[in-house]
From Swiss-Prot:
One Gene Ontology cellular component: cytoplasm
Biased composition (Low complexity): 449-460
Function comment: Plays a role in the formation of clathrin-coated invaginations and endocytosis.
Protein family according to the UniProt entry: Belongs to the epsin family.
Residue list for modification Phosphothreonine: 465
PANTHER family documented for this protein: EPSIN-2, EPSIN/ENT-RELATED
Annotated spans, 3 X 3 AA repeats of N-P-F: 494-593
Protein name: Epsin-2
Domain named ENTH: residues: 12-144
Gene: Epn2
């Protein structure tokens, strides 16, 4: 510690200077080096405090008023004031403008040392620069912004240097001081250039100066800390690299395992599919005896279930062995009635009632397999066909099958459940409710119920008829007229009809307004149409009263005709007038209510 610094500290204690004043006195001391940047930064930060600002400015103005041998006080005060204007509070520049005359007077500062050197030139030049800056507001703003940015940047650098504990060389008891004074200036002032190290960036130099260790022990400590920190950083980086590499290798290994597993699964599926395709191709060859469909191939892949029991479902496709196909074709009996066979079984024979049997059968197929024709009784039982909708015929053999018969209760009727739902009456009662008619006559009305076979005449043929199956709706459909061939017309006993003409059907008295169309035989057998025309236009012809009367309640004759023959008087009138037989027939069936 020099003598000047000891004397300065003694004055600070005696005069009871504040902290801000002590710092200003330290920055503007008479020592042969310039103020440090860190000290000027602390003073600039104190300018934002009102109390410290007044103390700082009072001490600065006091230092500017020195003269003579204390020219360093003046020069350092101008340097500190320039720094405070650029980085301190704005009130510093305002107060400097107010007291600008004090700065302008320093342009005439004179001091010549004992060696004859003019030391006042530095003060004069500095005062001129400061006055020019205070007068130019735009320049002051630009300089202030730039200085603030530099201050912030240097503060960040100083923080980084302090945290990293970077050493910049061996320390010594003599601090490396930086100053803004050039060697030429100090040469003129008689200073030793070796004692002053000029620097273009005094702030960086001051930061480095503070970071340098002062003793050898501190230097060793900083070196050990730096080595430990560098080793820790290297280990962390190596661990992070190894961790990243290991995670990457793990991901690659997992991806390879997953792809390998997928490839194995795909190959296993291919090996399962290839034999199936080969079997399907072999089955589809022309010379193959066992042709299977793709659906059966898929069903073969399923595990085998137990033996399939026969179904009693009335609507199932398979039928029992004692049943015959009602549509004419004979089907070979089969134990398997499930349309979806189990695994490992051969496909059953086709039970399609509309197709031709594919399997070879020892039973001969009858030539006449028309399901709508009248049933015939062949010699052999194998070729029997049964008309499901035809008229009932006595069955002498047990091989015939009647769809609606009950077989005296031995076999359960397929439609008995539906018949029980429709009516609670017995089949005999429902059959008795239908009005009986002679089986030889044809029903004139399509909405009349069909005649039923008498139970007394055929006691052994107790069966279900379509009428009993349909119940009360039997009158809506004439099944015999739709399925069986019409019965041949009975011989007409009407003497007025032409030979070979068909017997006219009874006319409904409520439909007399509709003309009766002539048949083809009537058109062929009728005489010239002129007689009928003359009948309508001849003079003196009176309206012929009906010679017959409709008797709806009369018993029907054996011939099936419901018309009463004309008497002799009517025959004479017809002969005298010349009415043709067809006209006489239509006249004889006139409605008596329309006279």
């Amino acid at each position: 510690m020099t003598t000047s610094s000891i004397r300065r500290q003694m004055k600070n204690i005696v005069n009871n200077y504040s902290e801000a004043e002590i710092k200003v006195r330290e920055a503007t001391s008479n020592d042969p080096w310039g103020p440090s940047s860190s000290l000027m930064t602390e003073i600039a930060d104190l300018t934002y405090n009102v109390v410290a600002f007044s103390e700082i400015m009072s001490m600065v103005w006091k230092r500017l008023n020195d003269h003579g041998k204390n020219w360093r006080h003046v020069y350092k005060a101008l340097t500190l004031l320039d720094y405070l204007i650029k980085t301190g509070s704005e009130r510093v520049a305002q107060q400097c403008r107010e007291n600008i005359f004090a700065i302008q007077t320093l342009k005439d500062f004179q001091y010549i040392d004992r060696d004859g050197k003019d030391q006042g030139i530095n003060v004069r030049e500095k005062s001129k620069q400061l006055v020019a800056l205070l007068k130019d507001e735009e320049r002051l703003k630009v300089e202030r912004v730039q200085a603030l940015k530099t201050k912030e940047r240097m503060a960040q650098v100083a923080t980084g240097v302090g945290s990293n504990q970077i050493t910049f060389g061996r320390g010594s008891s003599q601090p490396n001081l930086s100053t803004s004074y050039s060697e030429q200036e100090y040469g003129k002032a008689g200073g030793s250039p070796a004692s002053y190290h000029g620097s273009t960036s005094p702030r960086v130099s001051s930061e480095l100066e503070q970071a340098r260790p002062q003793t050898s022990g501190e230097e060793e400590l900083q070196l050990q800390l730096a080595l430990a920190m560098s080793r820790e950083v290297a280990e962390q980086s190596s661990e992070s690299v190894q961790t990243a590499r290991g995670s990457k290798e793990e991901r690659l290994r997992r991806g390879d395992d997953l792809r390998l597993q997928m490839a194995l699964e795909e190959s296993r599926r291919d090996t399962v599919k290839v034999p199936k395709k080969k079997e399907a191709k072999a089955c589809c060859k022309p010379g193959s005896h066992s042709q299977q469909t793709t659906l059966l191939d898929l069903m073969d892949a399923l595990p085998s279930s137990g033996p399939v029991t026969q179904k009693t479902e009335p609507w199932s496709a398979g039928a029992s062995a004692n049943q015959t196909n009602p549509w004419g074709g004979t089907v070979a009996p089969s134990n398997i009635t499930d349309p979806w066979p189990s695994f490992g079984t051969k496909p059953a024979a086709s039970v399609d009632p509309w197709g031709v049997p594919t399997t070879a059968s020892t039973q001969s197929v009858p030539k006449n397999s028309d399901p709508w024709a009248a049933s015939q009784q062949p010699a052999s039982n194998a070729g029997k066909t049964t008309d499901a909708w035809g008229a009932a015929k006595p069955s002498s053999a047990s091989g015939s099958f009647e769809l609606f018969s009950n077989f005296n209760g031995t076999v359960k009727d397929d439609f008995s459940e539906f018949d029980n739902l429709r009516t609670s009456k017995k089949p005999a009662e429902s059959g008795a409710s239908v009005p009986p008619q002679d089986s030889r006559t044809t029903s004139p009305d399509l909405f009349e119920s069909q005649s039923l076979t008498s139970a007394s005449s055929k006691p052994s043929s107790a069966r279900k008829t379509p009428e009993s199956f349909l119940g009360p709706n039997a009158a809506l459909v004439n099944l015999d007229s739709l399925v069986t061939k019409p019965a041949p017309p009975a011989q007409s006993l009407n003497p007025f009809l032409a030979p070979g003409a068909a017997a006219p059907a009874p006319v409904n008295p409520f439909q007399v307004n509709q003309p009766q169309p002539l048949t083809l035989n009537q058109l062929r057998g009728s005489p010239v149409l002129g007689s009928s025309a003359s009948f309508g236009s001849g003079p003196g012809v009176e309206t012929v009263a009906p010679m017959t009367s409709v008797a709806p309640h009369s018993s029907v004759g054996a011939s099936g005709s419901s018309l009463t023959p004309l008497g002799p008087t009517a025959m004479n009138m017809v002969g005298s007038v010349g009415i043709p037989p067809s006209a006489a027939q239509s006249t004889g069936t006139t409605n008596p209510f329309l006279l």
